[in-house]
From Swiss-Prot:
Gene3D superfamilies: 3.40.50.20, ATP-grasp fold, A domain (3.30.1490.20), ATP-grasp fold, B domain (3.30.470.20)
Binding site for Mn(2+) 2: E260, N262
Gene symbol of the encoding locus: rimK
Cysteine pairs bridged by disulfides in the record: none
Binding site for Mn(2+) 1: D248, E260
Claim: Protein biosynthesis is one of the keywords in the record: yes
Top-tier EC class: ligase
Any one Gene Ontology molecular-function term assigned to this protein's record: metal ion binding
ATP-grasp domain mapped to chain residues: 104-287
Keywords: ATP-binding, Ligase, Magnesium, Manganese, Metal-binding, Nucleotide-binding, Protein biosynthesis
The protein's name in its UniProt record: Ribosomal protein bS6--L-glutamate ligase
E.C. no: 6.3.2.-
Domain of life, per lineage: Bacteria
Organism name: Escherichia coli O139:H28 (strain E24377A / ETEC)
């Protein structure tokens, strides 16, 4: 097969591993910067051009689209879909997962347990917003934040009010969430491919922090997950219509709670921690699903 990887930086670990895994299985691979793609949207002869040339047909496309370029990145992916390329995660699913509010609404509607959460835009009644989620301690987030940026633990009501007031000055969407103390600064990242959790790690925040993101200095170890955690991770990925997802789970006294569903999970931390060839599993999923039937279904 001919496979395109959409990424702004082909030197990143995840891109290199996916390219390596695809080549090892006999596929042709090209890494394309989605921002350098430009598109002819024409009912008779749609096409995608890249750095002065018209791109050939790709059997499959692997999107590694960063949050900052979601709009144009998903537009480029959508054009590949229109031309009959199989996407490892469809453009609409990626856009849905990047919208934190919509994601939580969809998960809640499917009965998937979440931390008690409130969301507001520059709330005038800060006190009621805090009461709505059960009071302090609580976590205050900017909806647009990633990798732990724009996330604050407010341990007292006064601190919560101060943080919310500060965020209000940014004219931003504010997410207020109960703090799961018993998780002790840890979460579980489940890597879902299709209908299977192929790997899981426990991420522990560095000392003095409560955010377990590896980008912020957190540590990782292999996690043994329960059948309930496995089920909720797969259900969350399926709810978001993602073939590949990183599902972040908190272990609360009342059971596992989904924190986030990531449409473009990094592979470095979880592959190096578990020793599992996740990139290879993703390529094998493509081999099973980038079929003639898919092209016929999409008009490719």
């Amino acid at each position: 097969m001919k496979i395109a990887i959409l990424s702004r930086d082909g030197t990143l670990y995840s891109c290199k591993r996916l390219r390596e895994a695809a080549i090892q299985r006999g596929h042709l691979v090209e890494i394309l910067d989605p921002l350098s793609c430009y598109m002819n949207i024409n009912p008779a002869a749609s096409s995608i051009h890249y750095k002065g040339r018209k791109l050939p047909h790709f059997d499959a496309v692997i999107p590694r689209i960063g949050t900052a370029i979601t709009f144009y990145g998903t537009a480029a992916l959508r054009q590949f879909e229109m031309l009959g390329s199989y996407p490892l995660n469809e453009s609409v699913a990626i856009a849905r997962a990047r919208d934190k509010l919509r994601s939580m609404q969809l998960l809640a509607r499917q009965g998937i347990d979440l931390p008690v959460t409130g969301i507001a835009h520059s709330p005038d009644d800060t006190s009621d917003l805090i009461d709505m989620v059960g009071g302090a301690p609580l976590v205050v987030k900017l909806v647009e934040g990633t990798q732990g940026i724009g996330v604050v633990l407010a341990e007292t009501r006064q601190a919560a009010e101060s943080v919310i007031d500060a965020f209000r000055g940014l004219n931003a969407y504010i997410l207020v969430q109960e703090y799961i103390k018993e998780a002790q600064g840890c979460d579980i990242r489940c890597l879902v491919v299709g209908d299977e959790v192929v790997a899981a790690i426990e991420r522990r925040a560095k000392e003095g922090d409560f955010r377990s993101n590896l980008h912020r200095g957190g540590a990782a170890s292999v996690a043994s997950i329960t059948p309930q955690e496995r089920e909720i991770a797969i259900k969350a990925a399926r709810t978001m219509a993602l073939d590949v997802a990183g599902v972040d789970i908190l272990r609360a006294n009342r059971g596992p709670l989904v924190m986030e569903v990531n449409a473009s999970p990094g592979l470095e931390g979880i592959e190096k921690t578990t020793g599992i060839d996740i990139a290879g599993k993703m390529i094998r999923w493509i081999e099973r699903h980038a079929t003639t039937e898919y092209c016929l279904k999409t008009g490719g």
